[in-house]
Design a protein with these regions (language model features):
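Iron-sulfur cluster-binding cysteine motifs and their immediate structural context
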Residues: 28-42, 46, 89-92, 96, ...
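Cysteine-centered iron-sulfur cluster-binding motifs in ferredoxin-type domains/subunits
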Residues: 13, 20-22, 28, 58, ...
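N-terminal glycine-rich dinucleotide-binding loop that anchors FAD/FMN and/or NAD(P) in oxidoreductases
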Residues: 48-85, 99, 129-131
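Phosphate-coordination loops involved in phosphoryl transfer and adenosine-cofactor binding
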Residues: 8-10, 82, 107
């Protein structure tokens, strides 16, 4: 049996909730390069939607602010929002991951004619229940 040693030891964390942010920070503080992937436009996940959370019954901003500052200050963490994993290949220790990143802006060539709105469906998922 041959052990595979990856030459690129970048860690991909999928999900930018509190757990994902914490996992990314812990790995980065151990010296690893980390890519934190979130499908939504911002980090925080369900906790960001809460009024207060257990055990201290504090507002989500108090706990999230600390993690967001740590992420911002850590050069080993790269955050990709509005991104989804489309394919994974490889084997343990050596994966290739394809990521689709959604656009964040309207191009300058847009004339606001309304054709784009007609071309796409207007059904939206229930964003509070993730589906």
């Amino acid at each position: 049996m041959t052990d595979v040693v990856a030459t690129n030891q970048t860690i991909l964390v999928v999900g930018g909730g509190i757990s994902g942010m914490t996992a990314a920070l812990e790995a980065a503080e151990c010296g690893k390069e980390v890519i934190l992937l979130e499908k939504g436009p911002s980090l925080g996940g369900r906790v960001a939607q809460l009024y207060k959370y257990f055990p201290k019954l504090c507002f989500p901003t108090c706990g999230m602010e600390i993690n967001l500052r740590r992420i911002k200050g850590n050069r080993k963490v790269r955050v990709l929002t509005m991104a989804e994993v489309t394919a994974v290949s490889g084997e343990a220790g050596n994966y290739n991951v394809s990521v689709n990143i959604a656009p964040r802006y309207v191009k300058e060539s847009c004339t606001a004619c309304g054709d784009c709105g007609k071309a796409v469906e207007t059904e939206f998922a229930d964003e509070h229940n993730y589906g």
